[in-house]
Swiss-Prot record:
It comes from the Bacteria. This is NAD kinase. The active site is at D85. The keyword Plastid does not apply. Keywords: ATP-binding, Cytoplasm, Kinase, NAD, NADP, Nucleotide-binding, Transferase. Involved in the regulation of the intracellular balance of NAD and NADP, and is a key enzyme in the biosynthesis of NADP. Catalyzes specifically the phosphorylation on 2'-hydroxyl of the adenosine moiety of NAD to yield NADP. It is an enzyme of class 2 (transferase). GO terms for cellular component: cytoplasm. The keyword ATP-binding applies. InterPro entries: ATP-NAD_kinase_N, ATP-NAD_kinase_PpnK-typ_C, NAD/diacylglycerol_kinase_sf, NADK. It comes from Bdellovibrio bacteriovorus (strain ATCC 15356 / DSM 50701 / NCIMB 9529 / HD100). Its EC number is 2.7.1.23.
Length: 303
């Protein structure tokens, strides 16, 4: 990933891969079909002169090398994901800020991030190798957790960051600030801070709005608020937001892209802003976001 360029130039760019480059694989671990397809993809790429690596935290695919070192990950020119959106988000985490584009094939249920059909896998990969695909930037979210003024954790997310009560029996009382000004204080099961990419995930299920991927916004959506007036809010993504638990005994879980990262207490302040990194997503040149909404979510379907 690289310094965010979407403010100046949010247009797609052609993806060109040099021969004999390195390509990484991330696959859905518990799906036999994904494991089988990963082997076939590895062989397909090797026949075309590419070095293929299995990315960390998964069993090494036959015929590939394990990406064990920082250099292995740094040298990747493309990552291919075989799975669902959860697998795609795992690939984003594994890249840890690298500007490596991801090409996703859906082997899950919804497949909003893994937008390409697994049935078209080899045709799409061939088009990618021939330079017929494009990469499009998606904004990301950055958060840091302060305790007594000191940073104790930092995270980057493609979809969302969530503060939720988890298994706690009582609602959490959360104060939200924008540029140090109080926005709201609400009792709820939690709050979602979503990027435009994440607006169609947990945010949508919680009643939040869909945001076009190029929208320079965050959406903050309460989860089951104990209030008739608490509603989702859109904020410009050049603003800094902060969240604090009100009450000395309050605790909550902090979740990044679906993975629990840490526990929050009343001593913590969560500060959220736009990440300095963009994520690069591989798409066909004629890809249409609204077609994807209709296909995956039946958006605007009158039937």
């Amino acid at each position: 990933m690289k310094k965010s360029s979407m403010d100046k130039e949010h247009k797609q760019s052609k993806l060109v891969l040099k021969e004999n480059g390195s390509i990484g694989l991330v696959y859905r671990l518990e799906t036999a079909q994904a494991v089988s397809l990963a082997k076939k993809v590895a062989e397909f790429l090797k026949e075309r002169g590419f070095e293929v690596f299995t990315c960390p935290d998964q069993k090494v695919v036959a015929g590939t090398k394990a990406a064990k070192t920082k250099k292995h990950m740094d040298d990747l020119k493309l990552v291919i994901v075989l799975g669902g959106d959860g697998t795609y988000l795992r690939a984003v985490r594994l890249l840890e800020g690298r500007s490596v584009p991801i090409l996703g094939f859906n082997m899950g249920s919804l497949g909003f991030l893994t937008a390409h059909s697994a049935d078209s896998c080899f045709d799409i990969i061939e088009k990618t190798l021939e330079g017929k695909m494009v990469q499009r930037p998606r904004s990301m979210i950055y958060s840091k957790i302060l305790r007594k003024g000191k940073v104790r954790a930092e995270y980057h997310a493609l979809n969302d960051m969530v503060i939720e009560r988890g298994s706690m029996s009582q609602l959490i009382n959360t104060a939200i600030y924008s540029e140090k000004f109080l926005v709201s204080q609400v009792k709820a099961d939690g709050f979602i801070v979503a990027s435009p990419s994440g607006s169609t995930a947990y945010n949508l299920a919680a009643g939040g709005p869909i945001c076009h991927p190029e929208s320079p916004v965050f959406v903050v959506t309460p989860v089951a608020p104990h209030s008739l007036t608490s509603r989702p809010l859109l904020f410009p993504d050049d603003r800094e937001l902060s969240f604090r638990l009100e009450g000395k005994t309050q605790k909550a879980h902090f979740i990044v892209d679906g993975q629990k990262m840490t526990e929050l207490t009343a001593d913590d302040e969560v500060i959220v802003s736009r990440s300095c990194y963009d994520h690069w997503m591989v798409r066909e040149a004629n890809h249409n976001y609204f077609h994807l909404l209709r296909e995956k979510l039946k958006f605007g379907d009158r039937n």
